């Protein structure tokens, strides 16, 4: 979406894999500053948030966090655009069910900072690299994030569903691990634990909420096929909006006219 977006804005992109770059050989900050001599803007998808923070503090050109293991800010900008398109407002009741991961963290940050709407989080599964207990406590103190008991059953959670405008889920197993044989046992354990938390038609009975998923979806696990079928246009709009939101970020950072 970023590469298509910068092309639509009239720019040119260069794709560099970390493993094939001088970042694995040299001193990272020096390499980053050299990259900045050759481009006008950098978007990086990195594993560690610490690396993102290091690069953001030392870059000589605008630097965008495309995704890391702790946060996924650009996804949430796309989600916000989707809410505006569907509801005309960010003042919605929003229930997230799934893993406490980078997408969830950015949702928490968004709702608590925008101070509009209410995010309810039911997160029985925890990705250790994403956890920041102090961050969650500060978000809860704003009143715009409500942390549900992670041991709550889906039957108990149904009492919240009837009042929600949006239900949101994400993959339970990160995409780099889903088909990794070395992770097979852990994957099976995770899926067995989380199957009771699938978003399906039975769970949604009596609900007016739309269902969103940031993709890729593992249909039959976190979300059932019939729920996907009924909400596919919403989910595809959400996915397309990544490109539009990212174009807005890049155009803003570069300044009007620089891409024309």
Which residues make up each language-model segment?
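Short, charged, surface-exposed secondary-structure boundary motifs
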Residues: 24-25, 72-78, 129-133, 244-248
């Amino acid at each position: 979406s970023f590469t298509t977006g910068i092309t639509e804005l009239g720019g040119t992109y260069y794709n560099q894999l970390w493993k094939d770059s001088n970042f694995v050989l040299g001193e990272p900050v020096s390499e980053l500053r050299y990259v900045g001599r050759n481009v006008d803007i950098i978007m990086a998808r990195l594993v560690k948030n610490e690396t993102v923070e290091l690069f953001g503090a030392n870059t000589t050109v605008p630097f965008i966090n495309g995704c890391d293991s702790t946060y996924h800010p650009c996804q949430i900008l796309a989600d916000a655009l989707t809410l505006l398109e569907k509801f005309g407002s960010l003042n919605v009741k929003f229930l997230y069910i799934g893993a406490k991961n980078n997408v969830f963290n950015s949702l928490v940050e968004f709702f608590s900072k925008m101070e509009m709407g209410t995010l309810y989080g039911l997160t029985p599964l925890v990705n250790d690299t994403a956890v920041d207990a102090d961050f969650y406590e500060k978000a809860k103190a704003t009143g715009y994030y409500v942390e549900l008991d992670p041991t709550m059953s889906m039957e108990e959670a149904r009492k919240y569903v009837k009042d929600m405008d949006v239900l949101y889920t994400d993959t339970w197993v990160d995409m780099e691990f889903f088909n990794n044989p070395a992770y097979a046992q852990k994957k099976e354990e995770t899926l067995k634990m989380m199957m009771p938390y699938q978003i399906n038609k039975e769970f949604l009975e009596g609900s007016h909420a739309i269902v969103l998923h940031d993709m890729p979806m593992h249909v039959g696990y976190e979300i059932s096929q019939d729920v996907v079928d009924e909400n596919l246009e919403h989910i595809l709009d959400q996915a397309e909006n990544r490109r539009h939101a990212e174009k807005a970020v890049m155009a803003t950072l570069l300044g009007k006219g620089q891409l024309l």
